[in-house]
Amino acid sequence: MRTRDQEEFQRKKIMLMEKCYDCYAENGLASVGIRKLAESCGCSSAVLYIYFRDLDDLIVQSTAYCMKKVEDDFMAKAPTDPQDLMRFIDEIPYWTARQHGKKYRLMYQVYTHPKYIRYGKQFFEGVNRRYTEYAKSLEPKLGIPYTTITPLIFILIQTCVHYAMFEDECYLQSQLEALKQAIRLCMTQYRTEDARPDAKAES
């Protein structure tokens, strides 16, 4: 296949994955068949089988691609300045719910299904790697080891996802308050340690 043909094939495949995922997100995994997917894409069922082996392949690839895009959207909003951190923590759950609530509900339908759970494990292995790298980038700015930052990021992500799916304000506020307290304690602790005379001597 020529490069231009490959690019066009991939462009069309991405469009199909996005439209199919949106269709599932609006209607639920169990309520949508190949015919309804084709209608949402403006094509015939046969066209979908050019790009995907079967319905399972379409579901797996569409979920992985679209949720990676959601993750990219989240990371694009993530602060690099520590001064923006608390504001970000307060705002990001509501943004996540508005922008991606339906997509997260569908993701959990897919990745908790016995047929697809192994793909969910693979997806979240990638998530773990990417957020660990983000934590490493924050380490010199916050003065907190990335091994401490990483679990705090995971708590924030889980809190955002839970709120996006269920809009549970009580759970959200309790988690955010605990998270912000933990961050403040960590920042105080590591600043205190850095200020110790023996710490300066070691450095």
Q: Which residues does each predicted region cover?
A:
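Amphipathic alpha-helical packing segments from all-alpha helical-bundle domains
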Residues: E71, K115-G143, T147-P151, E177
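Helix-turn-helix
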Residues: M15, K19, C23-D57, Q61
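Amphipathic alpha-helical segments used for helix-helix packing
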Residues: A97-R118
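Short alpha-helical scaffolding segments that buttress acidic/His motifs in well-ordered protein cores
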Residues: I92-P93, M107-Y111, I153-C160
